[in-house]
């Protein structure tokens, strides 16, 4: 993470945001998951340093859409939907195997997952959050993500969305008292 923050080899992707979500709800503010991801874009990311946004949602998106977006390069991924220890369940339902085959070398996003158990490391050789952190290309160069925030347990629907909203507000310096200049500061 320190090398990535101090000496990034690729930077064009950092202004791209990706939202992956179900179309289920209601959750935060009575919104469905995809509407909530659109809110994160319109309320925070679009007025910060992010220039483009792609939403990959149930009903209009696919696994290949999500993989293509990640491989092309994104700086942040907000996922809101069902998940488990080995993958996401909605929008672009990536699995551990999909993450281990990504080709986004040196274009590593930070990921906020609102879903059950993606970080359940204690019962799996490689849980979904870990797969993002450990992924490499054929030459051993990092792929996957620079950081992934995800639950280790089954969780309720709406309260974690409040956390995702708050993390995006901190990342985009929307509250003066919560300014962070590094991934570690988030």
Locations of regions flagged by a protein language model:
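Cysteine-dependent hydrolase recognition
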Residues: 1-186
């Amino acid at each position: 993470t320190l090398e990535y923050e101090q000496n990034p080899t690729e930077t064009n992707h950092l202004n791209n945001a990706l939202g992956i979500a179900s179309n289920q709800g209601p959750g935060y503010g009575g919104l469905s998951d995809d509407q909530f991801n659109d809110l994160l874009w319109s309320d925070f990311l679009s007025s910060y340093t992010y220039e483009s946004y792609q939403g990959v949602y149930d009903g209009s998106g696919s696994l290949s859409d999500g993989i293509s977006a990640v491989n092309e390069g994104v700086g942040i991924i907000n996922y809101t939907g069902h998940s488990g220890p080995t993958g996401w369940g909605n929008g672009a339902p990536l699995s551990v195997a999909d993450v281990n085959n990504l080709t986004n070398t040196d274009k590593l996003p930070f990921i906020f997952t609102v879903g059950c158990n993606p970080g359940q490391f204690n019962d799996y050789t490689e849980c979904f959050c870990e797969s993002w952190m450990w992924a490499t290309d054929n030459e051993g160069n990092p792929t996957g993500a620079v950081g992934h925030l995800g639950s280790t347990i089954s969780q309720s629907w709406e309260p974690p969305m409040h956390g995702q909203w708050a993390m995006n507000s901190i990342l985009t310096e929307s509250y003066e008292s919560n300014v962070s200049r590094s991934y570690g500061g988030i």
